[in-house]
Amino acid sequence: MNKILLLEQLKKVPYISKQNLGLILEKRDENLNYWVKKLISDKTLIPLKKGLYISRYYYDIISEISPFERENYLIYLANSIRQPSYVSLEYILSKSGLLPESSFSITSITLKSTRKYVTDIGTFYYKNIKREFYYGYKIKQFKGKQIREASIAKALFDFFYLRTFKSEEEIQEFITVSGRLNWDILNTNDKKQLADFITTSKSKKMQKLLFILQKEKII
């Protein structure tokens, strides 16, 4: 195996598939499996899911640039591991300060089934949503590639839409007390956007949420 050639290739790409590793290493089948296991064992490769990896070298280079660049890289990986998807829910709410606790998972919305991937660089958690609610995300850039993350309003919509409440009283108690949500973070545009998302959803539960948010003068 030409490890120098491999490292040169790995430092150019944000992730690599097992198939492309086989082409670089000129290995296949059990021989390829052997080398993949070896590269994982010596920390050259970090597995994201079956057949998909990143290089420790690339991850360390990005992390050294800045925390902001590392965060965008993780969002890019979250978008790539399970497609289509966009980062949302607790991760965005925590990042914005609306949730007081840090999110230790990169949480995303997907059109595919709910799934969780635990890796050495973090946990990537995906929740399914109906196709008609798959919108409300912003397009940003990472190394010339698009990354998708929800606006604060859409992350809030996703968060409440996918959460189970037994009654209006439980919704009210959560948004005013137990949820510990810092509603002061929302600006006028966030509030309008959230109200618009809820109104157009035609979800009875979300209409109840909007009624309570307005009654409590939150939006």
Give the location of each predicted region.
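Short beta-edge/loop segments at beta->alpha junctions of small alpha/beta modules
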Residues: M1-I81
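Short aromatic/basic micro-patch
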Residues: Y15, Y86, A150
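Structural motif detector for alpha-helix initiation sites
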Residues: K18, L89, I152-A153
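Hydrophobic/aromatic-lined pockets within catalytic cores
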Residues: E26, I40, G97, Y161-F165
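Short coil/loop linkers at secondary-structure junctions
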Residues: R28, L99-P100, K204
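Short gly/ser-rich loop at a beta-strand->alpha-helix junction or flexible surface loop bordering the NTP-binding
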Residues: P47-L52, Y57, R70-D120, Y126-K130
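A contiguous pocket-lining binding segment that forms or flanks enzyme active sites
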Residues: Y117, G122-E149
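Hydrophobic alpha-helical interaction segments
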Residues: Y137-I219
